[in-house]
Amino acid sequence: MVSWIISRLVVLIFGTLYPAYYSYKAVKSKDIKEYVKWMMYWIIFALFTTAETFTDIFLCWFPFYYELKIAFVAWLLSPYTKGSSLLYRKFVHPTLSSKEKEIDDCLVQAKDRSYDALVHFGKRGLNVAATAAVMAASKGQGALSERLRSFSMQDLTTIRGDGAPAPSGPPPPGSGRASGKHGQPKMSRSASESASSSGTA
């Protein structure tokens, strides 16, 4: 059985790259017939890719599933079967022609709703961002003011500790007693000196 990798490579090379190159040649040569042919192929291949997304999930267990995918892409590309032109002319074009107005209305409504939703969520996002910015700024300002206040209090206490003047009030009680005690020996010494001088005289 063909594995998923081989199937993916075949679809990528022969279902995408090969038609892309020939689409380039059709645009370059301005061949209307080839241009229409490859446009029909790309429409069918887009539908195939969309369906493949779901069938790979739910039908990958089916026997010969990947072989059928390769055979389908080859059938689309074959100039003998002209599978893409057949599917487009028989099914896709009539369906799109009958449902074109409804599809256009749905696309317009989806576009308007998506624009309104984008504007709504954009406004909400801006409001949330503005609120977060204001809260962050207020918190930062509060922290800065607290730090400045703490710095100013530290500076004030430092100035008081370094340059504080001496107290100008009366001396404490203990200082008078100390001076009196130290003054008594001086007085007794002067009295003894005067007595000795009078005795010698």
Swiss-Prot record:
Effect upon mutating residue 20 to E: In SPG31; loss of function mutation; shows severely altered localization to numerous punctate small structures throughout the cytoplasm; does not localize to the endoplasmic reticulum; impairs normal ER targeting
Gene Ontology biological process terms in this record: endoplasmic reticulum tubular network organization; protein insertion into membrane
MF (Gene Ontology): microtubule binding; olfactory receptor binding
Main location: membrane
Keyword Transmembrane included in the entry's annotation: yes
Keyword Isomerase carried by entry: no
InterPro entries reported in the protein's UniProt record: TB2_DP1_HVA22
Tissues expressed in: Expressed in circumvallate papillae and testis.
Transmembrane regions listed in the UniProt entry: 1-21, 35-55
Region called Disordered, residue ranges: 158-201
Membrane topology: Multi-pass membrane protein
Compositionally biased spans, kind Low complexity: 188-201
Positions bearing Phosphoserine: 152
Clinical condition linked: Spastic paraplegia 31, autosomal dominant: A form of spastic paraplegia, a neurodegenerative disorder characterized by a slow, gradual, progressive weakness and spasticity of the lower limbs. Rate of progression and the severity of symptoms are quite variable. Initial symptoms may include difficulty with balance, weakness and stiffness in the legs, muscle spasms, and dragging the toes when walking. In some forms of the disorder, bladder symptoms (such as incontinence) may appear, or the weakness and stiffness may spread to other parts of the body. Neuronopathy, distal hereditary motor, autosomal dominant 12: A form of distal hereditary motor neuronopathy, a heterogeneous group of neuromuscular disorders caused by selective degeneration of motor neurons in the anterior horn of the spinal cord, without sensory deficit in the posterior horn. The overall clinical picture consists of a classical distal muscular atrophy syndrome in the legs without clinical sensory loss. The disease starts with weakness and wasting of distal muscles of the anterior tibial and peroneal compartments of the legs.
Protein role: Required for endoplasmic reticulum (ER) network formation, shaping and remodeling; it links ER tubules to the cytoskeleton. May also enhance the cell surface expression of odorant receptors. May play a role in long-term axonal maintenance.
PANTHER family: HVA22-LIKE PROTEINS, RECEPTOR EXPRESSION-ENHANCING PROTEIN 1
Family membership noted in the UniProt record: Belongs to the DP1 family.
Protein name: Receptor expression-enhancing protein 1
Gene that this sequence comes from: REEP1
